[in-house]
Amino acid sequence: MSIFFSIRFWPAAISAAILWLPQVLGRSNGTAPNYTVEELWKLETTFWDNFLYPANVEQMEAINSTLFTQDVQGRVDITRVFNGSELNTEYIFGLFSDPDHVSLVGVPVDYSITQFIAQGNIASATTVVTFNATSFGNLLVPVTIDTWIMWDADGRIMQYDATFRWFGFLLDTLVEALAESINGTTSQATASLTQLLATTICATHDQYCTGANQQYDNNTACLDFLTSAIPLGKDYELGRNTLLCREVHEHMVQYDPALHCPHIGPTGGDYCVDDQTYAQKVLQKYFNQSWIVGVPSTGDIWLGD
């Protein structure tokens, strides 16, 4: 596989960039900051610089990343919504920060912004992120992520909306790579992936979900539920009652067992549940600020009540 990237950045400058951004950016017009396009580009690239491994480890260890406001709102199409800086720090940075742990896509190692337009305090971009899928023989996979990001006057992300483009194709590619590595069929690879993810989740449960946080009676009950009672999940079901959803949340259990253990348990907590129809997901009222710029936002059905 040959992948070419036109934009490269150096992690050594990341911390310094974070420190000076709030001081020089974000001239406010009294309602929302009015950045130049160049300033918004710098804010955009600063986020992606910190998204890459190992810079994301430093962000994760901060607990509450300074890249987010305390009440940040985030939505990811294949999963769900995420509220607050601590939760977003865990999911945005912690989810992809351990190359030695079993995961679907591994760790992000490079990126190229291929589309970008910005105005005021909002930028819309398409970013192709290269992940090292360490659980699939260090397979390098390009993942396309479309984002809308809004910043406050201090250069912190106050809300974002992210879409993983062609994610179903990505899942099929990973399964095919696994099938090739085991010299088996895609059905056999899917079964192998199911067993691998379930075994990892149950090991995490046994280690961290103890006492009041225990979700399964024992390891066998955990494996039986994850491999038999729920489906692996489709590409849009990483926020529903599936194994793939629990794979996402398994990475977070170590940081806050009381919060995240229910997400990998039989109930799914508030995240791995089938509580939305298609229409309810599409029409969900969520964001505090409208993404519409320059014209009245009357009729914006995504604005929260």
Swiss-Prot record:
Lineage: superkingdom: Eukaryota
This protein's record includes keyword GTP-binding: no
Signal peptide range in chain numbering: 1-26
Keyword annotations: Glycoprotein, Signal
Glycosylation sites: N29, N34, N64, N83, N132, N183, N218, N288
Role this protein plays: Part of the gene cluster that mediates the biosynthesis of aurasperone B, a dimeric gamma-naphthopyrone. The first step in the biosynthesis of aurasperone B is the production of gamma-naphthopyrone precursor YWA1 by the non-reducing polyketide synthase albA, via condensation of one acetyl-CoA starter unit with 6 malonyl-CoA units.
Family the UniProt entry places it in: Belongs to the bfoA family.
Protein name, as recorded: Aurasperone B biosynthesis cluster protein A
Organism: Aspergillus niger (strain ATCC 1015 / CBS 113.46 / FGSC A1144 / LSHB Ac4 / NCTC 3858a / NRRL 328 / USDA 3528.7)
Record gene name: aunA
